[in-house]
Amino acid sequence: MIQGGDPNGDGTGGAEDTIKGEFSSNGVKNDISHVRGTISMARSTDPDSASSQFFIVQSDSTHLDGDYAAFGHVTSGMDIVDQICKDAKPTDGNGTIAKDQQPVIESIRMVD
């Protein structure tokens, strides 16, 4: 998987305001499964701690269903996600990429 949305670029950042975790183990029905291409909210161990960080599932990870708030799907460009994951050179066990090598989302489009 690939994770983004951290303003600090080190996996620790986020907005001051957080949102309720919208997944079944937190009392909210969410039928979106964590299959390849799913976009979901990242969070800490607190189920209501999501803010700006998100992740894109590169390969089916249905073990996350019910515990993370999936909210969308990549409609095109999974080849780019695959290439980023392939080229990544993590600096630690958490998959952190050096700041000068982190990919940047330059544009995004939401589709209904």
Question: Predicted regions: what is each one?
Answer:
Residues 1-112:
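Cyclophilin-like peptidyl-prolyl cis-trans isomerases
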